[in-house]
């Protein structure tokens, strides 16, 4: 299985090139790039007000207001410090870098810029991991509508943090492959007792979402992660956040890869069968052609 990159490579490569050229004393060039990411996220890299010595990185998330309620602004201020500026129009967060005043730790700054989406997501997880660590119960469940028709729920108890993703399967085939995929997660936990518990429910929401407006339907699935203190403590939480916030994309990416592989194998098998059929086809009988005198025509 393939782990999706947590960082955004386009941001990192663009900034790294800008920093490298600036350090070499090269004339700065204009940049204007708009590109998308998973979950409807949109990025914009540009020169604000046409100033080529400044590079702005902006991100737009449809669900950013919900993240703000869980401390997203405070976390980003802690991580990015003075690089965090007022967001440009149409975006939620903007970072500004001055090519005439390069930071000493360029690699670290570039990497953190590439982690912008992850760091926006991280606030809700850090908040509930902290609740669990402090033994708090009864806090309201976090509800993040991270896609138009899909939702993430986070809830903490004294001994665990429960994260539930709802997801929509577009085809019946996706449901079948998704079930097989989730079964592999269950099998994997038997081999590693330190892995979190993973549950999958189809059509109906899990008990954790009882008495909520969680969606119900034949194409609806719910993936539940039960995270214990060994997954949420200070030394492990960063890696946990890296992995869990991309899980929905990870699942659907592998469903698509599985379908593509199956189709490729089907085409290969069809081609093999056609070759066998062509070899088995009998040759057409050659009719002997004779003249009126009884002589036989011979082909030249």
Curated annotation (Swiss-Prot):
Subunit structure: Component of the Arp2/3 complex composed of ACTR2/ARP2, ACTR3/ARP3, ARPC1B/p41-ARC, ARPC2/p34-ARC, ARPC3/p21-ARC, ARPC4/p20-ARC and ARPC5/p16-ARC. Interacts with SHANK3; the interaction probably mediates the association of SHANK3 with the Arp2/3 complex. Interacts with DNAI3; this interaction reduces binding of the Arp2/3 complex to the VCA domain of nucleation promoting factors.
Organism: Bos taurus
Name used for this protein in its record: Actin-related protein 2/3 complex subunit 2
Reported function: Actin-binding component of the Arp2/3 complex, a multiprotein complex that mediates actin polymerization upon stimulation by nucleation-promoting factor (NPF). The Arp2/3 complex mediates the formation of branched actin networks in the cytoplasm, providing the force for cell motility. Seems to contact the mother actin filament. In addition to its role in the cytoplasmic cytoskeleton, the Arp2/3 complex also promotes actin polymerization in the nucleus, thereby regulating gene transcription and repair of damaged DNA.
Entry's transmembrane regions: none
Top-level division of the source organism's lineage: Eukaryota
Modified residues annotated as N6-acetyllysine in this record: 275, 295
Entry-linked InterPro entries: ARPC2, ARPC2/4
Record family assignment: Belongs to the ARPC2 family.
GO molecular function, one term: structural constituent of cytoskeleton
Any GO BP annotation: Arp2/3 complex-mediated actin nucleation
CC annotations in GO: Arp2/3 protein complex; cytosol; endosome; focal adhesion; glutamatergic synapse; lamellipodium; muscle cell projection membrane; neuron projection
Subcellular location as annotated: Cytoplasm, Cytoskeleton; Cell projection; Synapse, Synaptosome; Nucleus
Alphabetized UniProt keyword annotations: Acetylation, Actin-binding, Cell projection, Cytoplasm, Cytoskeleton, Nucleus, Synapse, Synaptosome
